[in-house]
Amino acid sequence: MGNRETPDELAPTLWRTARALANEDRLRLLRIVADGGGTEPVSQVASVAGLPRPTASLYLRALNARGILGVERRDGRVFYTLKPDRSLPVAASVQDAFRALFRRGGPPVGWEERLVPGIRAFSHFRRLAMMEALLRSPGLDPEAWRGAVRIPPTSFAHHFAVLLRSGLLRRDGRGRCSVVRPSDPICGALFAALASIPDQPQTGPSMRSTRASVT
């Protein structure tokens, strides 16, 4: 009970969780762990993924650190399991989305590559602030949008490009931007986490959410 995240803690948890997921090899490892049911040691998981054991171990630890994977030690060996830390709402909702994805006969070939751009949209606190600003005020032109989030022009241009590649932005004929609701369950879980952050007093880059409609 006392370990559950507060709204103030949820935003950094969200972008750090997304950062851990925004990697094709890490997504592949997550699928392998799910398929193995926690019965395969790290060395076997690495072999199936075609990764060096130290690299696989590093990636698995990153997923465990964000609460997405559980870890068990048996007979001197390390096993990762599809048991999220339920005290971390983002990890739990993302894990539930992955379970649903894996139950549907398995994701299609190339699923990792297709998921990464959308996940990357949530993997930086400035991009969260930018999406949150559009949720509050849909249809902003880029200049008004940048002014709303107070991000330097060069940085704004970079994050704007990342969001465009993610497919989560829509621009009308006048260049005004709105957030597009994600269609895949993984990005949908991340989006729901962003939208669940209650309004907070603004003391820096805004992390508040809104009930404004999105497309």
Predicted regions and their residues:
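Alpha-helical residues within the helix-turn-helix
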Residues: 46-47, 64-65, 147, 164-165
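Charge-rich, low-complexity terminal tails
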Residues: 164-172, 176-192, 199
